[in-house]
Amino acid sequence: MISQNNSIGTIKEIDGLRGVAMFIIVMSHFDAHFLQSGGVNIFFVVSGFFITKIISNKGIDFSIGNFYISRANSLYPQLLFTTILVFILYLIFGELEKINYFFNSFLAAISSTMNLYLIKQGNVYSNQEYINLFLPLWAFSVIFQFYIFYPIALKIIFSFNRFFKLSPVRIFYILIISTVISYIAYMYYFEKGNDVSNFYSPFSRLWQFLLGG
C-alpha cells in the first residue's frame, strides 16, 4: 500500500503485519463484515512506527523539509500515475454526464484530501448516485496528512529535549499519554454518532499512528 524508507532496514515482523493487513483488506472487499477497516488500521499503526523510527534516528538534526521532499518523491509518482490513468480511462469509458462528480473526486485524490472530501459529502461511502473510483485513496490521504503534522510535533519535542534533557523513557511516556488522549477523544466522537467524521478524520485516526510510534 505505502512504501517506507528502506534506510531503517527490513523488519520481518513488520513485513508480516503488512501481509496480514493486505489479506484483511482483500477479504473485506468480499465480505464487508470481515474485520471491517482492520487492515487499514494496521497500516496506520505500521506507518506510525516507521515514521517515528526514521525521525528518532536523526533526533534534533532531523530536517522537516528533507523529510517532506523524500516522502513526496516516494509517494507522489505512484499517486499521480494511478490517478491520471484512471482519469484517462474514465474519459474513454465513463459516464461523462457525471464528469463533475468525477473531477471533484479526482482533485481530492491528487491533493491527498480525499478523506476530507468524503466528510464534506456526508456519507461514509460517498455519493450513492456516483461510484467514486478514488474512494480507496482516503487512507492514503490520512497517512499523508499525518506525514505533514507528525514530524513537526516530534521536532518540537526534540527541541524541548535540548533544554529539559528528557530521557527516552519520558519521551515514551509522552507518546503513551498522547495516544491515550487521542483514543479517548476518538471514543467520545464515536459515542456521539459522528460516523463520517469518525471514519475519515485524521484526528480520529491519530491514536493508531501514535500507537505505532
Predicted features, each with a name:
Residues 1-213:
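Membrane-interface helix/loop caps of multi-pass membrane proteins
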